[in-house]
C-alpha cells in the first residue's frame, strides 16, 4: 500500500496546543513540509516569537531559539551572520513584528539580511487577550477598542508588505490567504520560494499570512475563514510585492 500522507519529519510528536480553528497549526505544518522537501531540517535554526506561537520550539524538530518580544529578526540576523551555512527563519505575529518589533523588521529588510520571515497577520493580540494590533481593521472591535477601531483615535492599519516594498533590501515579499485548499497550496509555494531565495543567497524575504483568531474574533472557525476573504483581503490584498 502506498502512503500518500504522513506527519512531516520537520514536526515533533507533540500535539499542537492552539485554539480550535487557529491557523498557526496550518502554517507550522507547511513550514515543516517545506523543510522536509528541501532537506533543511538538520540544517535549520528557527527563531520563535513572543505570542501564541511562543511554544513553537515544542512542535518543530529543527533547532530553535526563543527571542525577546519583537526581536526575532535581530536574533535571526545574528545567527545567520555567525553561522552563514545554517538555514535561518523567523516566525512572528502582527503584534510582535508590526508593533514592538517594527524597527527590527524594517532594518533587517533594509539591510537585505539573508533570512526568511513568516509573518502571521490575524489583526489581534491573541495570547494577551485580544487587544487591538497594528493590523486591526477600521471598525473592528478589540478589548482595547470595544466600539471598534477609530482612525481618529487609533490611527490606521499598517500594511507590512507594502511598507517593506518601499525598501531596496528585500528580495521577495508575498501575502497569502490560506482560507481554502488552493490558498494553502499558495502558502506552501510562497514559503518554499522564500526558503529557496535564502539558499540562493538572494537576501531578505517575508511571507505574510492572513490568519484567523476564532477565540478573540468570537466567530466559528468557518465564519472566520469567510471573514478573512470578505474583510481582510480588501485591506490586505494577497499577491507578490517584490520578487527579484
Residue ranges and their predicted role:
Residues 50-52, 122-124, 180, 209-216:
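Glycine-rich beta-alpha junction loops
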Residues 62-65, 108, 133-137, 223-226:
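Short, hinge-like loop/turn segments at secondary-structure boundaries
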